[in-house]
Amino acid sequence: MIHSKRLRLWLYLVLLAVFIGACGMKKEESSKDKQIKENFNKTLSLYPTKNLEDFYDKEGFRDQEFEKGDKGTWIIHSKMTIETNGKNMESRGLVLYVDRNTRTTKGEFIVRELWEDKKGYSRSKEKEYPVKMEHNKIIPTKPIADDKLRKEIENFKFFVQYGDFKDINDYKDGDISYNPNVPSYSAKYQLSNDDYNVKQLRKRYDIPTKKAPKLLIKGDGDLKGSSIGHKNLEFTFIENKEENIYFTDSINFKPTE
């Protein structure tokens, strides 16, 4: 009888220890999830910034990588990539370097095409069109004979100018992940076509699918902040061997080169 009571007591203590350990792990995971969301919210709070010149006065995260007196450079990049069945993959986007020291901005509009040759080797070609930004307008710095392309560049809007994540905390069933070895972290959400940002993308791009996208927010580097790390947004509408349709966006603050 005494042996039986001791056995029951031992089993009770083991179960209690397992329960406490599980609660501790769950609490730690919840704390990490919260930290990841807070980290992303700092970047997402930049959306929208309708006037790109506002970045001249926006301060980003600074660390020992910055030299004394360097105010830093914002790097803004928006790109749409489309590959439909039987056609080459094409990406069109613009990257802008906003130098807070000189209060000048330069960048490139980039058109890239990818395909496989008859032997199955990947091939690509890329064209870059240099631009500058003045008075919140994108201006090509070299003549462009193609009027349609020139207007596309001049009318280009970055996602940060119209995207809005004020409802990010209402997104449900997010898949939060963290890899301490890199370190890297991400949050993935299934969006609907009624989502504000999805509507904005469809308004500006000819997206050849009615499928609603998944939103992936990802970053790397120290969760507390790092000028070495990067943060990116990716709206993936379709992703398979035959078709790929996705939009990527990033805003990063770096030491001026």
Curated annotation (Swiss-Prot):
Residues with lipid group (S-diacylglycerol cysteine): C23
Pfam families assigned to the protein according to its UniProt record, in alphabetical order: DUF576 (PF04507)
A cellular component term, taken from the record's GO annotations: plasma membrane
Signal peptide positions (record): 1-22
InterPro entries per record: Csa, Csa_sf
Main localization, broad class: membrane
Lineage of the species this protein comes from: Bacteria, Bacillati, Bacillota, Bacilli, Bacillales
Annotated localization: Cell membrane
Protein name in the entry: Uncharacterized lipoprotein SAOUHSC_02789
Topology of this chain in the membrane: Lipid-anchor
PROSITE patterns in the cross-refs: PROKAR_LIPOPROTEIN (PS51257)
Protein keywords: Cell membrane, Lipoprotein, Membrane, Palmitate, Signal
Family: Belongs to the staphylococcal tandem lipoprotein family.
Lipid group attachment sites (N-palmitoyl cysteine): C23
Residue stretches in coiled coil: none
